[in-house]
Amino acid sequence: MAAQEVLLVTTPEPTALVDAYAMVKVVHLRDSQKPLWLLINNAQNQEEAEETIEQLQSATKRFLNRELNVLGMLPTDPFILQAVRQQRGVVDLFPQSPAAMALHAAARQLQEKIPLQKDGFAAFWKGLSTEGL
C-alpha cells in the first residue's frame, strides 16, 4: 500500500463492522506496522460511537493483537443530507453543523498526531513503484 497511514471510516451497522474488520485484517496482513485510524460515521450519539469503537477494538486486539488509533465520531446530522442534495460539502455549506464541527476536530487531531513529511509525495510514488497499483 502506498499510503503511510490508513483512515478507516465505518458506521455502527453490524455489516459495516464486519467490512471494517475485514479491511483492518487486510491492511494488517500487508503491513502490520502501518498506522490505522478509526472514525465512526453516522453515530446517533456518543454512546453508540463508543460501543462501535469497543466492538471493533476488541476484535482487532483479540484476533490481530493490534490497537486502532481512534479519531472519534461523526454524528448523524440532517445537514449532511441537505449538503448531498445540493452536491456540496457539508463543511462548506453548513460550517457550524455538528458533522462539520466533528470533521474539523478529526482533522485537527490527525494534524497533531501525524507528522508532516516533506517527502510525502515522493514516498507515495516510491510506494506505488515498489508495491504496484
Describe each model-derived feature in a short phrase:
Residues 1-15, 24:
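Inter-motif core of Ras-like GTPase G domains
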Residues 11-12, 36-51, 73-80:
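G-domain G4 guanine-recognition motif of GTPases
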Residues 17-36, 45:
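Conserved C-terminal guanine-recognition region of P-loop GTPase G domains, centered on the G4
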Residues 25-28, 44, 61, 75, ...:
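Signal for well-folded cores of large energy- and translation-related assemblies
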Residues 31-32, 61-67:
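Short helix-capping segments at alpha-helix termini
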Residues 64-89, 103:
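Beta-strand-loop-alpha "switch" segments that mediate conformational coupling across diverse proteins
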Residues 89-133:
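NTP-binding/hydrolysis catalytic cores, primarily Walker-type P-loop NTPases
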